[in-house]
UniProtKB/Swiss-Prot annotation:
Protein's recorded name: Lipopolysaccharide core heptose(I) kinase WaaP
Names of the cofactor(s): Mg(2+)
Species this protein is from: Salmonella typhimurium (strain LT2 / SGSC1412 / ATCC 700720)
Lineage, top ranks: Bacteria, Pseudomonadati, Pseudomonadota, Gammaproteobacteria, Enterobacterales
Disulfide bonds: none
Family in the record: Belongs to the protein kinase superfamily. KdkA/RfaP family.
GO molecular function, one term: kinase activity
Length: 265
């Protein structure tokens, strides 16, 4: 199965897309046993390629023991991108997808997306907020936009599984005006798509977002602002209904922080 969009429909017409993918050269961003991420140029534009080369039995068993679905190919990200566009959530633009093989251990697949440039991750954009606070209106504007994006994503049946601020890209130039604000969510290769997002997975995304923004100087008021936008309810009602999530977020964020510190020792 192969799906191509412009310019690949023209450049690769009559050719084997899998053979063309093998010849692509560029900057390697990640090289794993079963996955390769490459940035390359084609016809004067920059793109990203994710090349999946099956998986190992060890990886499948490890994920199943952890009650997680292993990433078996590029199809999950391809479908998530299209679903987010349907929901009105800014994300990558997919221009190519291919998959062949039935056996998950040997299945080969690829996805090609446009390089979102110029952009900066929110992790980098907000890195010095704790010491150099931004204009309050700009901060609240970004908080509101991220909350709206995640709300739409979850309402549309998608949970990210790696929902951290480093996976939200702010498009540049950004002047501080709302009409210039565009944020795209990326790295959807582990995303899950269902009719409804289970509470457990909704909470995992929200906790990941909370943890990844702990060091950028957000106040309790900022967090409440996010919650009001995400849940679309009065704060008092949110605090009553979501007390379990709030407690879980504090406990899990502290646990993740401890684990991160131990890994860096």
């Amino acid at each position: 199965m192969v799906e191509l969009k412009a310019p690949l429909t023209t450049l690769w017409r009559g050719k084997d897309a899998f053979e063309e993918v093998k010849t692509l050269q560029g900057e390697v961003f990640r090289e794993l046993e079963t996955r390769r991420t490459l940035r390359f140029e084609l016809d004067g534009k920059s793109y990203f390629l994710k090349w999946h080369k099956g998986t190992s039995l060890k990886e499948i068993v490890k994920n199943l023991i952890s009650l997680r679905m292993p990433v078996l190919g590029a199809d999950r990200e391809w479908h998530a991108i299209h679903r987010l566009h349907e929901l009105g959530v800014d994300t990558m633009h997919g221009v190519g997808f291919g998959e062949k093989g039935v056996n998950p251990l040997t299945r080969t697949s690829f996805i090609i997306t446009e390089d979102l440039t110029p952009t900066i991750s929110l992790e980098d954009y907000c890195a010095d907020w704790a010491v150099n606070p931004p204009d309050a209106q700009v901060k609240w504007m970004i908080i509101k936009r991220v909350a709206t994006m995640v709300r739409k994503m979850h309402a549309g049946g998608i949970n990210h599984r790696d929902c951290y601020i480093c996976h939200f890209l702010l498009h540049l130039p950004f002047t501080g005006r709302e009409e210039d604000l565009k944020i795209s969510v990326i790295d959807l290769h582990r995303a899950q798509i269902r009719q409804h997002v289970p509470l457990r997975w909704r909470d995992k995304d929200l906790i990941g977002l909370y943890f990844s923004s702990m060091n950028i100087g957000l106040t309790q008021r900022d967090i409440f602002r996010f919650m009001r936008e995400y849940f679309s309810l009065p704060l008092r009602e949110i605090l009553q209904k979501e007390s379990g999530l709030i407690h879980q977020a504090d406990v899990k964020a502290a646990r993740i922080k401890e684990r991160t510190i131990r890994k860096n020792l």
